[in-house]
Amino acid sequence: MQLYLVLLLISYLLTPIGASILGRCTVAKMLYDGGLNYFEGYSLENWVCLAYFESKFNPSAVYEDPQDGSTGFGLFQIRDNEWCGHGKNLCSVSCTALLNPNLKDTIQCAKKIVKGKHGMGAWPIWSKNCQLSDVLDRWLDGCDL
């Protein structure tokens, strides 16, 4: 029990100040305002679905992929080995900039990624959870854009 409390306290202390999960409609509005609705032919619903399955709408999310050793950053879990930081840095952005809750750098980098030959298929989680979904409309239910 003591170990559990210590681990809980440590995880609380390591949570970045100001880190918060964004609401679904907040994410939709920010992505819409950032010009992602039908960008390269992909509806806003696809982008919101991707954001949910990649980060659960957490713009501060950082997850390491144990399979390839890369780390994903931010709302869309953009990988450091190719798109940001010290890797190929095809987005010309620091990985930590992708953790900003204003999503400006995240949206600009996502636009570069989706312009590539794979489109949104560059995110395998989108292909698995969003691409063939017949309920994409639900991602914008009740959102005032």
From Swiss-Prot:
Expressed strongly in testis and in epididymis, and weakly in brain and lung. Detected in sperm (at protein level). Keywords: Cell projection, Cilium, Cytoplasmic vesicle, Disulfide bond, Fertilization, Flagellum, Secreted, Signal. It is found in: Secreted; Cytoplasmic vesicle, Secretory vesicle, Acrosome; Cell projection, Cilium, Flagellum. The keyword Disulfide bond applies. The keyword Ubl conjugation does not apply. GO terms for molecular function: lysozyme activity. One of its GO terms (biological process) is single fertilization. PROSITE patterns: GLYCOSYL_HYDROL_F22_1, GLYCOSYL_HYDROL_F22_2. It holds the Pfam family Lys. Residues 1-19 form the signal peptide. SUPFAM superfamilies: Lysozyme-like (SSF53955). Disulfide bonds join 25-143, 49-130, 84-95, 91-109. CDD domains: LYZ_C (cd16897). The active site is at 54. PANTHER family: LYSOZYME C (PTHR11407), LYSOZYME-LIKE PROTEIN 4 (PTHR11407:SF21). Monomer. Belongs to the glycosyl hydrolase 22 family. May be involved in fertilization. Has no detectable bacteriolytic in vitro. Has no lysozyme activity in vitro. This is Lysozyme-like protein 4. The lineage of its organism: Eukaryota, Metazoa, Chordata, Craniata, Vertebrata.
